Amino acid sequence: MTDPVLASQLANGTGEMDGLCSELLLIPPPLSNHGILGPVQNTCASGELAPLPADPGCLLVEATATEEGPGNMEIIVEAVTGTLSPGAPEETSGVLVKVVEVYFCERCEQSFAEPTLLSVHQCTETHIQAVQDLSSPPCSVELPPSNLALRGPLQDPSLPDSPLPCPVCRQEFVQPQALKSHFKIHRVTPNMFSCPESGCVFSAEDRKGLQNHLRQTHKAVPVPCSFRGCSLLFGSQQGMELHRQAHYPFHCSHCSFMGSNVKLFRQHQRSHGASARGELSAAVQGLPSQELLPAAKLPPGHREPSEEASTPLPGQESAEEEDAEEEESVTQKDSQKVMDKSQGAQQLEGHVGSGTESLFKTHMCPECKRCFKKRTHLVEHLHLHFPDPSLQCPNCQKFFTSKSKLKTHLLRELGEKAHRCPLCHYSAVERNALNRHMASMHEDISNFYSDTYACPVCREEFRLSQALKEHLKSHTAAAAAEPLPLHCFQEGCTYVAPDRKAFLKHLKEIHGVRAVECRHHSCPMLFATAEAMEAHHKSHYAFHCPHCDFACSNKHLFRKHKKQGHPGSEELRCTFCPFATFNPVAYQDHVGKMHAYEKIHQCSECNFATAHKRVLIRHMLLHTGEKPHKCELCDFTCRDVSYLSKHMLTHSNTKDYMCTECGYVTKWKHYLSVHMRKHAGDLRYQCNQCSYRCHRADQLSSHKLRHQGKSLMCEVCAFACKRKYELQKHMASQHHPGTPAPLYPCRYCSYQSRHKQALLSHENCKHTHLREFHCALCDYRTFSNTTLFFHKRKVHGYMPGDQVWQFCNASQELEGARQCLAPPSDSGPSSQLSAQPEREDREHEIVANSNMDQALPETNEEASPKRQDGIEAPQEDDQVDSPSLGEVEEGGCTLHLEALRVELEPETEPLPLEELTETATVEFRPLDPSGPLGTERPGGLEEPALSSFDSIETPALVAEEEPVVEKLASEPPRNPLISEEAPNTFKAALTAETVPLPPFPESESLLKAMRRQDKEQAEALVLEGRVQMVVIQGEGRAFRCPHCPFITRREKALTLHSKSGCQGRREPLLCPECGASFKQQRGLSTHMMKKCPVLLKKNKALPKPVSPTLHPQLPDNQASQDAESRKPPPLPSKVELLLPKDAPSDLPGGPGVEEPLPTPSDFPTSPPENSLPTGTSEKFHFEQGKFHCSSCTFLCSRLSSITSHVTEGCRGGRGQKRKRGRPQTHAVVLPLNNGDSTLLNTGSTESSPSDGDTAVVQKQKGALFSCPTCPFSCQQERTLRTHQTQGCPLKSGDLHCGLCPFTAPAAAALRLHQKRRHPTASPASGPRPLLQCGDCGFTCKQSRCLQQHRRLKHEGVKPHQCPFCDFSTTRRYRLEAHQSRHTGVGRIPCSSCPQTFGTNSKLRLHQLRVHDKTPTHFCPLCDYSGYLRHDITRHVNSCHQGTPSFSCTQCEAQFSSETALKQHALRRHPEPTPPSSGCPVEVTEGPLHCSHCGLLCPSPASLRGHTRKQHPRLECGACQESFPNRPALDEHRRQHHFSHRCQLCSFAARERVGLVKHYLEQHEESSTAPSDGDAGQPSLCCPFCDFACRHQLVLDHHVKGHGGTRLYKCTDCAYSTKNRQKITWHSRIHTGEKPYHCHLCAYACADPSRLKYHMRIHKEERKYLCPECGYKCKWVNQLKYHMTKHTGLKPYQCPECEYCTNRADALRVHRETRHREARAFMCEQCGKAFKTRFLLRTHLRKHSEAKPYVCNVCHRAFRWAAGLRHHALTHTDRHPFFCRLCSYKAKQKFQVVKHVRRHHPDQADPNQGVGKDPTTPTVHLHDVKLEDPSPPAPPAPSTGPEG
């Protein structure tokens, strides 16, 4: 039907439009079908002007025609490239032209209002022009349905991947969201309401006026659109229904269903089934157009399309809440967006006006001046102005502002809905959508919406907004169903009308007034004034603000209103700008957004202010002292999570930051940044008093202390120092405040130190030699970096930070570093690693770091047990040790060495070297001291460092890490121990990376260590005041040993102690002559035969000097012949490395033979008269790795020692050198520059005709080279060059003292020095007289040596005594070898078996006898063979001494005893052992094999002997516990039998009594004397007598003698115990600490017994069996509880009621739930509180989606264990439950209860009618539950006899 009025308007307005904008003439067609959904074709007559093509620069998109007049035509034109201006003003009478921006598609030339719509647009093959206007004024007449026919066949939208067509323009879209976004362009809100009746030109500005016009003029009832947000009126219901379809983007192709909810639309499509899909195309094409209109009769199951068709029912609210956003004022929002775009970006709240930017210090957008509270918000906002290509969707090319939004968008496009509802089939992309679904669909499950909404009529509260709206409809429907009589509201009028028309007529006729109707579409109420109507109209809104008059029906608007806050009574003014407001919410929002950089967060406790709220929260913790963040691996706590994340790196072994220059690796990025300053030369910190510069602030702070005075002073002795750590060390060493600093013993000798760094330096210098330091300017080498620093400062004049020195010597240092980095040219296949000189830092600082040294004394008390354990056992990798000083000092300033204990790790078997070289090609490189040591693979990859040390968390950057370099290849042994351990260390270090980790981290040794720590922690709890220790009198008497401090409560134990264990009753063996004491008879006999001084005096006829030579003397001629024929011994490679590079290699004596040359550092720098004589080198020679003195038997391994010996202390040359033959050694001839040769003779001797004996051939004398500036002289030019290169200590003109190294610039100073220091000095006149022993012929030059000789040889004094037992000896090396039996330190392992030895000689003898089995000495009288000469001597003395009376019948051997003959027969003529009587004869067909090593033995007896000797059963002699290998036994002895150690010295004892005795004898006596230092330490007094002491262990032992004992009481409760471990475990109940963790699950507990009890869960063993029914369980408590089911016993009764139970925990739960009101356990997700933790855990399962209980038959999952047990009965035929009143049976109990209630209602208690078949076995959960498909963890190893 055509509207003539509108057609005439368009016809008349065509010319005006042409004149207005002739360039943009796009003639619209006559709107004959205005208001109808359908495409509009642009047609024009042939005689008229042809329309212009759609220019991309200017495209007419929308045209809205109104019916008021020809001049009110609004044209909306969107211009992309330019702006359009209207024509002449006179031609545009009343015409409005609005120019906005447009986005168009270049392919189909379709335009869009927003770029997002263009991004989701998909072009079709045919050009489709958009509809000009969708919401034009509708008409009330019957509309032809042909205009609504679908254009073309529709694709099946029921398929998941089928496109969705737009119902207006038929454009297809893949995604529903794209269709909905596109559908918005068809909606426009009308500005004028026109009359829908034909021929009527009435229009009104408001809807009410049109409604009154229709009723009064046309007598028609207006039908409003039932869609929310649409204000249009229609003349008939059919027109309204037809229009309402235009509001829904989704239309069903099978029926008239439509909607805007994607989920409901998909569900409706699935309801048609798959059969309708195949007939879709034909059905749509042949579908009559009337099907789209509402029919009178609909098919069954379909309801009339109404508001309910698109609005979900209560409980069906959309997850995305699309209906609430689109159906409620959606057209108003869209039009507002268009208006915003047309008018430009408006200035929103919080934006900064131009010119006022300086007032605000905040996160401000530079483009739109918008402000944000956080920088992250600004960064996300900037993506709007500057799109990030990485945040662009690859499918629709749409840009996003964050990765999370892009991820959500991609998930929506892919249709992946990861969040699923556990109660229904709903799924969503986002978690919030699922929460909204749970709140709307499952009200009682989720508490996502915490708001409540009250009904404005009856004040009833609702949790869901939709429920409130439905409730409001009931009030409206009730008012409409029962209309109340209408009373006249005029004063004095009592008229009452039951009819609405009569009431209106009465008001109009009688009072002349007009009633105001309620604006609500379904409310019939009338009011006298508009104000009363408006007040009533608010009652139709669902949401009312309680603080103001605001009311609305949109929940989101209501929430937005509440967030905006309400004005208060006080005006709030901003302190940074003129802003003022009464609204506190607006004020906080303004300050947070506009002044984010200002310090707006003030501390209420102090004056602290900050710009960040997180910083304020962290600052407030300073006042409270709380540290909420705690490390799970140690006791570290901090205030901020960022500190914790940095601290966690200390527990990690990964070092991700590596320096590319030197290989330095670290865990912290900042450390690497600071380290890189060295390579860049960035010495940013400079001293203001000198030229010192460095790259670290802490180094500068330490340096500045040099220029300051000693500001710190000791209060006790007035000791002054500069650094705090120096004062702390002084107090610890001198005055012992509290616990003294622990002693760090050396692992290889008896050296001890209270400073760990000194110990590490000692071990490196004396024993390990793992790191060697080289001077880059000369050939100086040392094993101490401090000594290297002193060398550079003394010889080369180096000072840290001296720029002049660095500039002059930089090139030399670099050259020396390159030479050191170059690999050795003569490296053989063994690839020996030579130590590399360390590149010294230019800012090298000798002063130790004050921060670390300051921290060390604080941790001494805590770390002392760990350090002691670290001495005894290897540290685990995952344990954090004490601060690694190697990591603290950087660049080689300090050295931290940890010796690897390979023999203490039996689980890591080292690979053989052959397998190691086959499996991985390892390239040995020169060591870099500044980087880690690693192995390089062929691909260039670098393996992790073999040895590194973890650092602990420090508050500031105090140091950088420095990895420790281990020696991988064995060098010529400086120390035999190191040469033996180096290969094993290397193998173990490499295989530690390849061998898989043990299956569980909680080893038995770790648990024992934690138990010991728990015992020691009890003392700390006493000091903290959390535990009170009291002494109580025990029951019974105590028995004390009269000879020692042993005390016991059992008389039998005292008797046993007196017989065997008392050390005081053992009487020593005394020598009758001199009184020396011995423990064994053999020692006494040896002493009386050879060493007793009294017997030696009696038996001495003439004084004969005792020759200390080990070998027998040879005749002189034989000695000379041997000397002439002896070949020069080969030199070790260690001596070869000492040669300088310019030394010639073609020396006499054969290739490869090089003699060690004494360097100037080995000789004392003295004047010529005291320097080394010319013939010094003749007096010693080098043989078999040792330097031998040619005049006596002295030998050593160092060149400096032999030089000092032959120069000063050799006494053999004076009286014995002519009686002793000396071997001949070759001389080394070095060519000089002048062509001569200087013969350096190292002890060569020849027979001279002028001397009968061996004489010394005079050395060929050459020219002496002298230093021009000092008295130094030498015979070789190279030595002089080295002396000058190192730096002469004297300057030209300095004078040198001849008696000491003193130098002076003037002669007067030298004379004064000699007068003071050497007043009686006179030139030496001949040798000093020798001192001679009066008891023997011993002579020496020093009185100290003579005194020591008398004490050792004649007085029997043994100065070296073992601290662990009574062993004493005269030799220190014997003591060290003996102590290794106790400590295990220094033991030399055998490479073929796990045995260890204290000396190399015993190791060699062991290898000869056990492994090689090749005897070297033979008895000449029989077949006996041995491995030492002493074996043959002992055999001859015992078996062949005297007259041989026993002869062998099978050979000619004769013996002096029958026992020797039997041994010979068993050894030489073995016979098979006859079988014993009564035993079957063993038939042995061939040799017997050893099960351990596979050795073939001829007889069982030999096999038993072999097993007893070669594979002994290692058993502890104290506790008879057996071990698989020697290291395990040593570890056991160390841990258990020497576990009592003195805290003041290195003493250790097996039993506590020995330690008590040691304290009484050594420390208590010395501490009883009063002193100033001990005045502050109170004595410990006995509560029963006057005894006092200073050590708690002594007091405990004394109190035990009174029969008393200690009792520990908890201060928080009434718990008390005598056990220290138990009080520690109990205290954790109050603190919540749970250090014991299960390695198979997340279980943690406070004591190890609970952990052991818990570990049975992971085992399948069920060792407790019920004798009645065969029930098996894992715990005895389970069995006890089960037995009560058979006995019916319920011993636990509630004291407050009659409740009884058979379980104590059930009674506890009953009392907590029934008789307590406190609900201490709260759910963090929903806020519900519970009385017990079990109920809370049960409740938490509701929030989780996990269903851990899976049936092993059908794989059905259950959330509860009971559900699985009940379900398991469905797979069986058993019916265990039956009715006692009839024959009914069931599988579950509740079924029988339900049966009794239904069929036996007379039964009072239905549970009494339920019975259970006792023959039916109980369904156990482990029998029906499906186990985890992952491989089970290996069972934990047995921990002892308990299992």
Swiss-Prot record:
Annotated Basic and acidic residues bias: 330-340, 837-846
Biased composition (Acidic residues): 318-329
Gene3D superfamilies (UniProt xref): Classic Zinc Finger
Localization in the cell: Nucleus
Principal localisation: nucleus
PROSITE patterns documented for this protein: ZINC_FINGER_C2H2_1, ZINC_FINGER_C2H2_2
Superkingdom per UniProt: Eukaryota
Composition skew (Pro residues), residue ranges: 1157-1167, 1829-1843
Region Disordered: start-end pairs: 294-357, 819-888, 1103-1177, 1795-1843
Keywords per UniProt: DNA-binding, Isopeptide bond, Metal-binding, Nucleus, Phosphoprotein, Repeat, Transcription, Transcription regulation, Ubl conjugation, Zinc, Zinc-finger
One Pfam family per UniProt: zf-C2H2_ZNF142_18
Start-end of C2H2-type zinc fingers: 103-127, 164-186, 363-385, 391-413, 453-475, 543-566, 601-623, 629-651, 657-679, 685-707, 744-767, 1331-1354, 1388-1411, 1446-1469, 1514-1537, 1608-1630, 1636-1658, 1664-1686, 1692-1715, 1721-1743, 1749-1771
Keyword Membrane: no
InterPro entries for the chain: Znf-C2H2_CTCF, Znf_C2H2_sf, Znf_C2H2_type
Phosphoserine, modified sites: 354
Any GO molecular function: DNA binding
Protein name stated in the entry: Zinc finger protein 142
Name of the encoding gene: Znf142
